[in-house]
Amino acid sequence: MSLTEKDKAAVRALWGKISKSADAIGADALSRMLFVYPQTKTYFTHWPDLSPGSVHVKKHGKNVMGGIALAVSKIDDLTNGLMELSEQHAYQLRVDPANFKILSHCILVVVSIMYPKDFTPEAHVSLDKFLSGVSLALAERYR
């Protein structure tokens, strides 16, 4: 699913509003993923504490949203813009790419809760398409 110029503008506008809370969004989204989809915990067995609000969850949530910030800045060419992250997740971390969609869904949920007035139906569809594009770009090196 390709992003239209209208989608890109909507994502940039929404990111402009939510980026100040990116760390909290990332931590909450990651916490939700680990709780709702417990099979995702297998990637974090080296963490002593996977509970919401733990230091490791907060730190990785911040890293995730740093990747989203990068994706927003590379929105016109997600595949090439996220190639390094794709290689890292494919070759070093060996994350099942299905998990990108799971985390994307959790990000949508958190943004909708934290920014209900800004999360209009139009913003929702544009952010969903964008996160799908990010997931696809991250899965590029798995092929």
Curated annotation (Swiss-Prot):
GO terms for biological process: hydrogen peroxide catabolic process; oxygen transport. Red blood cells. It comes from the Eukaryota. Heme b binds at residue 89. Residues 2-143 form the Globin domain. PROSITE patterns: GLOBIN. Transmembrane segments: none annotated. GO terms for molecular function: haptoglobin binding; heme binding; iron ion binding; organic acid binding; oxygen binding; oxygen carrier activity; peroxidase activity. O2 binds at residue 60. Signal peptide: none annotated. It holds the Pfam family Globin. Involved in oxygen transport from gills to the various peripheral tissues. This fish has two hemoglobins: Hb1 and Hb2. They display the Bohr and root effects. Belongs to the globin family. This is Hemoglobin subunit alpha-1.
